[in-house]
């Protein structure tokens, strides 16, 4: 297939991957691998908004180091001192910016969304209608130790996660909908009932030690 411009920043053809959820690793592997190839051909974006979208896609591809590399480019090259996103187009094939630049909010929205995707994903919908909640799917090495609180997952869950040495140590999932919780960490998947207002307290093996208010 001829590709007329392999370096173009637009990736509308990958909408079904991200922010959509029709293309996933386990449900549509053929399309998923094709999406990876397509993004590899495009590089890492040029404008700030495209880098943010690419960063989200790399998180969906389970490529934490690539996602983090794009993030550092956003911060170092395309962010004003006041942390506003700088719509600073780069010269083709390089990280050297063109002379003009302006504020564009897309990067300010897209980069935090990508960080959340690196720590938690819940876009995969299972045949019974429930969502699979995946913990730390794209954690980069530089974030070896940390915690995050208050992330929201599809299916109606509020989630806190802690990790050390690049590995999950514990997680808490609070239900706001009463739906069952389907949780994945790496290759392990568990399912727990979780009534509205209750919280699951999981260890590093996804064992639930208590159900609390």
What are these regions (language model features)?
Residues 1-48, 69-87:
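Extended glycan-interaction surfaces of carbohydrate-active proteins
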Residues 2, 37-38, 50, 94, ...:
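A near-ubiquitous, low-amplitude feature marking generic local secondary-structure context
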Residues 10-14, 46-52, 62, 103-110:
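Aromatic- and histidine-enriched alpha-helix N-cap/loop-to-helix transition segments
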Residues 15-27, 53-62, 114-125:
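Well-ordered alpha-helical scaffold segments within catalytic/enzyme domains
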Residues 51-60, 89, 99-101:
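Conserved short loop/turn motifs at secondary-structure junctions
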Residues 65-213:
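Non-catalytic C-terminal accessory modules of carbohydrate-active enzymes
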């Amino acid at each position: 297939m001829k590709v007329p411009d392999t370096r173009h920043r637009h990736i509308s053809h990958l909408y079904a991957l991200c922010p959509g959820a029709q293309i996933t690793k386990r449900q549509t592997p053929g399309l998923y691998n094709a999406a990876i190839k397509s993004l590899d051909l495009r590089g890492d974006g040029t404008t700030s908004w495209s880098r943010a979208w690419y960063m989200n896609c790399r998180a969906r591809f389970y490529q934490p180091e690539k996602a983090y590399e794009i993030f550092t480019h956003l911060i170092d090259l395309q962010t004003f001192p006041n942390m506003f996103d700088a719509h600073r187009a780069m010269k083709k094939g390089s990280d050297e910016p063109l002379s003009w630049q302006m504020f564009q909010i897309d990067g300010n929205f897209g980069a935090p969304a990508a960080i959340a995707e690196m720590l938690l994903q819940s876009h995969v919908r299972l045949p019974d209608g429930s969502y699979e909640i995946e913990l730390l799917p794209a954690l980069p090495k530089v974030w070896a130790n940390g915690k995050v609180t208050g992330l929201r997952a599809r299916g109606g869950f509020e989630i806190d996660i802690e990790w050390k040495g690049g590995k999950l140590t514990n997680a808490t999932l609070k239900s706001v909908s009463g739906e069952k919780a389907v949780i994945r960490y790496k290759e392990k998947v568990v399912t727990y009932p979780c009534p509205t207002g209750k919280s699951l307290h999981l260890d590093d093996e996804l064992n639930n030690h208590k159900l609390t208010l």
